[in-house]
């Protein structure tokens, strides 16, 4: 507590407009429902708990003057760990790690964290739109094909398993697929080449909200479209389309300001495209990269 107060004093010397906090993984009386706050938790201006958002209701009653924040939240539990919080009294959360990065690999051949909703170049993965549906009032719908179910993967005692998702609509004829439609409005209709596969309502249950699951969706070449409606009016669409075979590679650097000093690092996104310039998500060819220069 003393060190925190000294650091807060230093911070307020430069900026006294902001509240301060410390991320904590709290002790508990009951692991599922009831925390046992340390002295530091009571001393901070904002009570920040890693993962244990289920303790907020009890601690809100004990400390009604406090503001609460989920300082680390698991991407595996996305949805419930946001919607189950009493959002009028909780200022939000931070998903860890929402962006992939080098380091903290879960094993070779990975060189870094790969459980985020954005890759290392900030390209959104399908479930990034699930996060957007929580925080944005702009109507949206987004299709995510479930390629592989998550397995129980522990990292520092937290389950970090995530499903492998894609937007790939190049499949095998007759394949039966499971998918999500992420949305923040009332209902979604799924259409395959113009034929309706049904309409599903957005569930108010925090464990299901904004994430509608569809099973046994038949594949056929063409277009799979999700149409979102609010109060009966179409407010958003998203579609996946079958592409041709990959015939070229498109390279896009993150910036044109690249210094050839042997130290500067540049992210270059390599995309396989078909004859119409569309991204081919089914392309898994091994690439050989050669860099020349002085």
Q: Where does each model-flagged region fall?
A:
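Short, solvent-exposed loop/turn segments enriched in Ser/Thr/Gly
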Residues: 262-268
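Broad gene-expression machinery/nucleic-acid interaction feature
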Residues: 178, 267, 286
